[in-house]
Design a protein with these regions (language model features):
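Active-site residues of response regulator receiver
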Residues: 8, 52
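Acidic catalytic/metal-coordinating carboxylates
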Residues: 32-36, 59-62
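Active-site beta3 strand of CheY-like receiver
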Residues: 44-50
């Protein structure tokens, strides 16, 4: 199954999405801000990114723009 990176500063949302995806058989990787998401993407294979738009440090839009410079993976913005 696919590796899915879930990124949101709200840990409850990350956990809820993660539980659902894991029940469906996906491997879930968790990040809690845009900087952490970029670091994860540089260090391990990810097939899909689900990212929140409003986060501290680096918001979802700016993180997505930086990620797109290096990685063409599919992204779902919440």
């Amino acid at each position: 199954m696919a590796n899915i990176l879930v990124c949101d500063d709200d840990k409850d949302i990350v956990e809820a999405i993660g539980i659902y995806l894991e029940q469906e058989g996906y491997t879930v990787i968790k990040a809690y801000d845009g900087v952490e998401a970029i670091n994860v993407l540089r260090s391990q294979p990810v097939d899909l990114l689900i990212i929140d738009i409003m986060m501290p440090k680096l918001d979802g839009i700016r993180a997505t723009l930086k990620i797109r410079e290096e990685n063409p993976l599919p992204i779902i913005i919440l």
